Amino acid sequence: MIEITVGHTPDADDAFMFYGIVSGKVKSSDFKIKHFVEDIETLNKAAFKHQLHITAVSAHAYYYLSDYQILHTGGSFGLNYGPIVLSKKKLTQNQLRDSIIAVPGKLTTASLLLKLALGTSFTEKETQFELIPEAVQNGQVDAGLVIHEAQIAYDKSVFYKVLDLGSWWNTETSGLPLPLGINIASTKLMNEAQIQAFQTLFKNSILYG
């Protein structure tokens, strides 16, 4: 049995996928698992240093990484669904191009999508994802790029949805799935047999959930 560190986010989909493992309902004789639960940009940055055996990362971040293998299970993608931009007032796309926009990290897929949709003339302000609605409400930024539960749980009496990047991608690609996040294994820290053993464990955890 080897000890491995597994990185994942606290959001609902990761909680669902890892519940079987975390709760002990899905057991492994191969691994003793230490969980590293952080926001996705922290996990993206940790991946560059090979600090984690297994981790969730943004699909965008994976482009810049080496010595990793994508797991067959646990990826997330959107079908006409994805990150959105919120503001306290109605803003056009042209106005957004001249705005200060809070983003949940420059390596996130959401940040890449925003640049694909608007170009690069807007000013990015990196902000922890859970603090972005508050930054918009307090006037620290003109708009905020939100991910995870904030996409559906935002207060519609306070915020306008001024750009839907899931819808934008759906139109631009004629309905292709939008790759958002993936799970990867460090080939520096694990051999192929260990990676395959974890994939089986992770699949069983998802099936249990």
Question: Which residues make up each language-model segment?
Answer:
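N-terminal hydrophobic or amphipathic helices and topogenic motifs
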Residues: 1-76, 207-208
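Short loop/helix-cap segments at secondary-structure boundaries that form the rim of catalytic
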Residues: 63-66, 114, 153-156
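General small-molecule cofactor/ligand-binding pocket signal
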Residues: 34-38, 123-127, 163
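Hydrophobic/proline-rich hinge and linker segments of small-molecule sensing/allosteric domains
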Residues: 71-93, 171-188
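Pocket-lining segment of extracytoplasmic ligand-binding domains
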Residues: 128-209
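Active-site regions of enzymes building and remodeling cell-envelope glycoconjugates
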Residues: 68-73, 122-123, 159-162
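Bilobed "Venus flytrap"/periplasmic-binding protein-like clamshell domains
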Residues: 2-23, 83-142, 149
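Structural motif
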Residues: 54, 68-69, 100, 143-145, ...
